[in-house]
Amino acid sequence: PYDLFLQSVRAHLRLLTVDVFHPSVPREKWLDAQDPKHVAISLNGEPTLYSRLSEFLEICHNHGVSTFLVTNGSLPKVIENLDTLPTQLYVSVDAPNKEIFDRICKPKFDTGAFNKLEQTLELLPSLDTRTVCRHTLIKNESLGHHEDYARLDNIADPMFIEAKGYIYVGNSQNNHTIENMPSHPEILEFSDKLASLTGREVLSDRRESRVALIGREMIPVVLPEKKLDLPSDLGIAKPQNFHLPQV
């Protein structure tokens, strides 16, 4: 886990290898970016499959780095048994009920995947950390169904609910069309109704991202206390060549 953390920072630093004397590069921001403050554990598959996740989280925190863990909720026992919790735990609630969940998410190995998601949501009120339910909303598929979403959100009682419109990019284009993208006004309409059903309000929104944040109040992220510094000879990651598999 420690090597994974260091390699992540090295990869981050490689992205910052720019001409720092160029007038378009704010030197103060470039210097600040040399010492990362946040890490998102997402996008590379389901992170709760990593058997040493707690150790990785603790290493991040000891270096003063906050952790944002995104899970699909398929492994509630892992969440329950984490010795170290992330700074913020996102649970992807991508469908309002089992029927739509099975159609959209297409679980391959577990016919009870939606029940596992519900078990994860039941855990959230007992976790001493920031929690978020994230809804990625697909027009004509999972958008709407406010009562079903509210039932799940009320079980989880998260600090925040994030309503995000589906974006027609990547491999999802094989399963959806551009008509499945909700507009920002549609996201706001959904969020207003969901906020009312969950005793919350719309705290913020971003038109460019077609996203709204629902909650009771804005609560800033507090960085973990920094106990360890990065090695002085850390260096940067070597260049990598990645090739997408041919379809």
Residue map of PLM features:
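Radical SAM enzyme core and accessory elements
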Residues: V211-V247
